[in-house]
Amino acid sequence: FFVDKFQIPLAKSYGADAILIILAGVSDKLANELYEEALRLDMSVIVEVHTVDEAKQALKFKDALIGINNRNLKTLKTDINTTFDIHDVLVSHTGPLISESGIKTKDELLELSNKTSIKTFLIGESLLKDLENNSIFSVL
């Protein structure tokens, strides 16, 4: 993730083609600057949200992918209901939506896919913990 717009050209020079803006970690002004700089350099932008208020703020980033992170940044606990709570705010966004973190089972993945317009998921911890069973892999 980025905290200064001067990081973006450097990342681009190292081959990056996208940046992550975590709205909980930057001011509104800086989020705008990061977004504009990335677009200027023909890079994709993922805007990450954790709350309904951040989701409302993210709607102005029309060319971004928006990720709903199910991890509470204060407690580090995950809850996929975060995606359900925030999704309705983002239905007008024309770009891709991503549900991030906390997806532990095939049933949770299917529930998110069936009850929202989201078809893109970031799954990390569950995949690493399930390397032997591979049960979640069969859904992907």
For the regions a language model picked out, list residue spans one by one.
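Catalytic beta/alpha-barrel core
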Residues: F1-D4, D17-D28, D42-A55, G67-K77, ...
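Catalytic cores of alpha/beta
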Residues: V3-G15, H50-K62, H93-I123, S135-V139
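Glycine-rich phosphate-binding active-site loops on the catalytic face of alpha/beta enzymes
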Residues: I8-K29, G67-L76, T116-F137
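Aromatic/hydrophobic pocket-lining residues that form π-stacking "cages" and hydrophobic walls in ligand
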Residues: L34, A38, I86
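Anion (oxyanion) recognition and catalysis
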Residues: L39, V91
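Glycine/Thr-rich beta-alpha phosphate-binding loop at enzyme active sites
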Residues: L59-H87
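C-terminal helical cap(s) of enzyme catalytic domains, especially alpha/beta-barrels
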Residues: I80-L90, L127-L140
